[in-house]
Each structure stands twice: as structure tokens, then as C-alpha cells.
Amino acid sequence: RRRIHEQLGRMDGTPMHIADATKELSILHSGYRGAAWEEKKVNGRNLNLILKELEDHPGDYEMMGYLGDEYYAAGDLDKAESWYRESIASMPSVLDERDQRSAATFTYLLQIMEENGNDIDEMKLIYGKAAGLLPKEADFDYLIGTYLAADRDYAEGVLYLERALDKLQRYGSNNRAMLIGSHLRETYENLALCCRKTGKDERAVSLCIAVLKSAPYSMEALYLLLEAFRGNGFRPSVAPEKAMGILEQLYCLDSMKDRLFVLKACSKLGWPELEVYIKRRFTAEELSYIRSAWPGVISAGPEEINS
């Protein structure tokens, strides 16, 4: 784009025919790495071109965003933040809904603010501007929701993360939702945690099961699932034998790997009634070996349970 991006074209200016082959072809571009990136930093290729472009067009908010990228990549967060804010202040009142450049400007600014320890209310001001200009972009909600979950503001975390997933489902990820699209499992796990902490156990269970169907060895998802099954009261929300039946649908308990994984999660949670059912799937010799190899993982108590 302008001085810093290249694009194909015909020498005589004849328009090119463009075809969308993204379903047929998958191309991974690793960007500038190693020696190429070091050379790029040393000679300041992009930086000089962007500065020249801004000299010629001082109000170009897109170039300001690219300049912020250069400083962000170089680790100069103060300059990066300054140029991202300048870019946002110069943006028009209406943006193209697939304006990936402007979305990146907002996204990187929010990330810098989080790195700098800015208050969440300050970040919400930037979020409000971002969501107003690009209402279909899920990444803004994803970032704020993730930060809220990390700050243990689980109730608000639910709102933002649910909204992020809703936008992703409604509007897709073509030229948008780059972050949430590459952190979908973590988003489900964070949302499940927020739901669990706010008493929405049914939603937490459905989210965890969705994760485990595609990533069965997510300890975070399995732990949250079992925690929701056990509940907070004197009696478990789900009876141990019923919980075991669900685990048998998610895991191949004939596999030692799966049995050990489930046993480890149960032991970590501390649900001895369910642990008894799981230990029944091991031979006495296997249990003896597990106790000697991994002390403390399982108790040495009786394996029977009163029917």
C-alpha cells in the first residue's frame, strides 16, 4: 500500500482479474524473520518510507497506524502508543467494515495499554471508539473480555466474551477477528471459567465439552467441567456415576493415556467419589505403579465404593 506495500499489476495499466482461491489454497507467510528482519531494522526501510509518506500526507491515519507498528515491533511502546492514538484521532467518522488496518491500530493500542497496566476503564474508552467504528470486529470484545477475566471480573468477562463469540459466529473471520480466531480454545476456556465463577454452570459445561471434543487433553477444560459437575454444595450437582458416563463418552478409557489424564484431573480437583470410579478402570498393578511413580497423584485408599 502506497510506498510500503507491493501489489501485482499490469505494466500497461489493464485491470487484473482477481479470483478468491482461499478455499483451494492455504499460504502461510512467516513475515520478516531472522537475517531479513535484522536487515530491515538496521536499514529502517519501512520507517523511512512511512515518514516520507506522512511528510507528503500528514493527515494519513493509515500511515500513522503503520508507523505505530514499526515502533511497536522495535519495542518502543511510548512512540507506538502515541502514533496509534494520533491515528485514531485522525480517523474518519465512517470506516469500511473490513478495514483491517484500523482494526489493528485499535487492537495494538489495547494490547499496549494492557502491557503498561492501564486501568480497565481507560481501555474501555478505546474499546467504545473501536466498537463504534467497527461494530462487527470480534477482537475488541475478545481482548477486553480476556483482560476482565484475568482481573477476576468474571461477570463483565462473560458479557464481553459472549459478545466476541457472537460476533465471530455472525460476521465470520474474513479480514477480521484475527486474534479470537487464533485463540478460540482459550476464549472458550476463559468464558467457561467466567461462567463457572458466576453460577452459570450449564453454560460452563457446554463450553468445556465443546473444547474437549476438539482438544481432549485440555486440562483447563476438563478441570472446569469436573468442577461444575461437583458443584459447590454438600451434594454434587452431577452424581459421580453420571459424571463417569460422560467422561466415557469424551475419552477412550481403554487407553492408558486417557485414563491417566482423567485420573490426574480428578485427583487435582479432589473429588474422591468420582476418583473411585476412575480407579476401577486400572488394574491393581497399574495403580501400584502409578502411586510409586507419581506420589500424591492418587490416594492409597480402598478402591471399592458402596453401591
Question: Each predicted region: which residue ranges?
Answer:
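Catalytic-site signature of metal-activated, phosphate-bearing donor transferases
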Residues: 1-75, 79
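TPR alpha-solenoid repeat register
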Residues: 63, 97-98, 105, 140, ...
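Structural register within alpha-helical repeat arrays
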Residues: 67, 108-109, 144, 184, ...
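Residue at a conserved register position within TPR or TPR-like alpha-solenoid repeats
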Residues: 71, 113-114, 148, 188, ...
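Flexible helix-coil transition and linker loops at the boundaries of alpha-helical arrays
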Residues: 53-57, 88-102, 116, 130, ...
